[in-house]
């Protein structure tokens, strides 16, 4: 018989956004005392795999009653191909998925049939899923955990101490044209001209730029 608890499926070690989509719920389950384990369904991802905080919960067995798939919705076909039908059978399957457009393509909607419900990270995503499927959809932003984080000063990154700072983060692997950092810079320059008296700064943080030097 399957155990009471939760299996989180996604990229537990992946140092990119979708990896956090699994890690934050995992840390919240740990704080709440809910039994859980994590399943790395695609360990050969090209993204860096150096976040080992959840290693002690890694498993290859779908032993719990509840599966939560913490992935981008575009990865649903790959998910089904790698895991097979048996992984979904006789379990309460939840998609905690990300999709940034107003509708899902039909080719992806067909892969929702194995799910019992969907969790959406934002109201926009919730509306999108409701337009795309009759499954129950719940708006559930990522949890905030009380884990201790390493603190850095502004001085370390040469950010003026008294400025109002805007932060934009993106991953080059997510396609620069889609993340559009140039538009962020233009919007900042438009809002705060060089003659402006406002003390403001724009900080852009990116990862994986070394793999996209032509961009």
Residue ranges and their predicted role:
Residues 7, 37, 94, 117, ...:
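A structural signal for isolated positions on well-ordered beta-strands in alpha/beta enzyme cores
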Residues 15-18, 37, 45-48, 75-78, ...:
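Short catalytic/ligand-binding loop motif for oxyanion handling, primarily in non-cytosolic enzymes
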Residues 38-42, 141, 204-206:
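Residue-level recognition of beta-strand->loop/alpha-helix junctions
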Residues 7-9, 27, 40-130, 134:
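Extended catalytic core of nucleotide-activated donor transferases of GT-like folds
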Residues 136-142:
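Short hydrophobic/aromatic-enriched beta-strand-loop microsegments
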Residues 20-28, 36, 146-215:
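Conserved catalytic-core segment of nucleotide-activated headgroup transferases in glycan assembly
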Residues 1-43, 64:
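N-terminal subdomain of nucleotide-sugar transferases
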Residues 9-10, 96, 121, 140, ...:
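Short hydrophobic "strand-cap" motifs at the C-terminus of beta-strands
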């Amino acid at each position: 018989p399957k155990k009471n608890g939760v299996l989180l499926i996604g990229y537990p070690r992946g140092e990119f956004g979708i990896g956090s989509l699994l890690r934050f719920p995992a840390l919240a389950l740990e704080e709440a005392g809910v039994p859980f384990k994590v399943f790395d369904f695609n360990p050969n991802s090209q993204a860096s795999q150096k976040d080992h905080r959840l290693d002690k919960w890694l498993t290859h067995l779908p032993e719990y009653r509840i599966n939560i798939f913490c992935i981008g919705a575009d990865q649903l076909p790959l998910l089904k191909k790698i895991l097979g039908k048996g992984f979904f059978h006789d379990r309460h399957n939840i998609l905690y998925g990300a999709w940034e457009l107003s509708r899902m393509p039909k080719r992806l909607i067909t892969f929702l049939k194995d799910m019992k419900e969907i969790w959406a990270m934002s109201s926009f995503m919730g509306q999108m899923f409701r337009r795309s499927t009759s499954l129950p959809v719940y708006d559930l932003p990522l949890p905030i955990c009380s884990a201790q984080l390493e603190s850095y000063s502004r001085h370390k990154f040469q950010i003026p101490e008294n400025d109002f700072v805007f932060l934009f983060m993106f991953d080059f692997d997510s396609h620069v044209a889609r993340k559009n950092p140039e538009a962020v810079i233009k919007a900042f320059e438009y809002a705060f001209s060089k003659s402006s008296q406002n003390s403001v700064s724009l900080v852009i943080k990116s990862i994986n730029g070394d793999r996209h030097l032509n961009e």
